[in-house]
From Swiss-Prot:
One of its GO terms (biological process) is lysyl-tRNA aminoacylation. Signal peptide: none annotated. NCBIfam families: genX, PRK09350.1. It catalyses: D-beta-lysine + L-lysyl-[protein] + ATP = N(6)-((3R)-3,6-diaminohexanoyl)-L-lysyl-[protein] + AMP + diphosphate + H(+). This is Elongation factor P--(R)-beta-lysine ligase. Substrate binds at residues 76-78, 118, 251. The lineage of its organism: Bacteria, Pseudomonadati, Pseudomonadota, Gammaproteobacteria, Enterobacterales. Its EC number is 6.3.2.-. GO terms for cellular component: cytosol. SUPFAM superfamilies: Class II aaRS and biotin synthetases. One of its GO terms (molecular function) is acid-ammonia (or amide) ligase activity. InterPro entries: Aa-tRNA-synt_II, aa-tRNA-synth_II, aa-tRNA-synth_II/BPL/LPL, EpmA, Lys-tRNA-synth_II_C.
Length: 325
């Protein structure tokens, strides 16, 4: 590509018109259901502790902060939205920019648009149904199918992910020609994620969206543990045509348990030589004050627009990708 061409948008103008229509349809969906649209900060003094997420960091120098105040671009609006929920705002949604300092490719740009929403009094299954309704309305696709994480592994890899040990997981990885990665990996959840990405994802959601629910409890993140089966978390993801679209939880409301999970993440980060991340004490205070029982989900809008257009890469639906920003 010549330098003179980089001033032009990444996406064709007709694609941007379709993008605007998708955004309008999303807003209509929530307005019709009485869900409040909110805006929360793009920067925070705290960030995520997840070992797989890498936030952008910046520094504010101004009145009262002559030595500088460390700030992080938000990887998701989740923490601020939960503070609004604890303050009594009721059901909310947000369309916003999120930022992740990681790979760039067909489905990734460091700056992207996220739809996130929270539903008080919804369990995981009721929110799954609402995500399905949204996808049908925006993409005009068939109703989704649902599989538990365990069912998906048993169907496509003939192994039980909830009981298999690391040796058994490595044996399955060998059948997928992944021994060069798996044989040196000591973290069981990383092995599971490798097998899910390479051995399960390619086979699901081909003709209609597929929800995968009840991830292992060790991958709960900010989700509650299932009261029926303590081996699994009330967490789900949805896939369609080779793309991960959304990640949702029946949200954890226990501040003490959430702090323990943040601290555990930071221990894992230390073991991998990654920097320790500041824990969001404002979120923990909101949980202490009382987060209502709720379920929430984050959905990648750019990826939905890709599917609506049949686009092959995220660059076809974003005005300016990072290499042209």
């Amino acid at each position: 590509m010549s330098e003179t061409a980089t001033w032009q948008p990444s996406a064709p103008i007709p694609n941007l018109l379709k993008r605007a229509a998708v955004m309008a349809e999303i807003r209509r969906f929530f307005t019709d259901r009485g869900v409040l649209e909110v805006e929360t900060p793009c920067m925070s003094q705290a960030t995520v502790t997840d070992i797989h997420l890498f936030p952008f960091e910046t520094r504010f120098v101004g009145p009262g902060h002559s030595q500088g105040l460390n700030l992080y671009l938000m990887t998701s609006p989740e923490y601020h939205m939960k503070r609004l929920l604890a303050a009594g705002c009721g059901p909310v949604f947000q369309l916003c920019r999120s930022f992740r300092n990681e790979e760039m490719g067909r489905h990734h740009n460091p700056e992207f648009t996220m739809l996130e929403w929270y539903r008080p009094c919804y369990d995981m299954y009721r929110l799954i149904n609402e995500v399905d309704d949204l996808l049908q309305q925006v993409l005009e696709c068939q109703p989704a199918e649902s599989l538990s994480y365990q069912q998906a592994f048993q169907r496509h890899l003939d192994i039980d992910p909830l009981s298999a040990d690391k040796t058994q997981l490595r044996e399955v990885a060998a059948k997928l020609d992944l021994s060069n990665i798996a044989d040196t990996e000591e973290d069981r959840d990383t092995l599971l994620q490798l097998l899910f990405t390479m051995g399960v994802e390619p086979h699901i959601g081909k003709d209609r969206p597929t929800f995968i629910y009840h991830f292992p409890a060790t991958q709960a993140s900010l989700a509650q543990i299932s009261p029926e089966d303590h081996r699994v978390a009330e967490r789900f993801e949805v896939y369609y045509k080779g793309i991960e679209l959304a990640n949702g939880f029946h949200e954890l409301t226990d501040a003490r348990e959430q702090r323990l999970r943040f601290e555990q993440d930071n221990r894992k980060r230390a073991a991998r030589g990654l920097p320790q991340q500041p824990i969001d004490n404002n979120l923990l205070a909101a949980l202490e004050a009382g987060l209502p029982d709720c379920s929430g989900v984050a959905l990648g809008v750019d990826r939905v627009v890709m599917l609506a257009l049949g686009a092959e890469s995220i660059g076809e639906v974003i005005a300016f990708t990072v290499d042209r920003a």
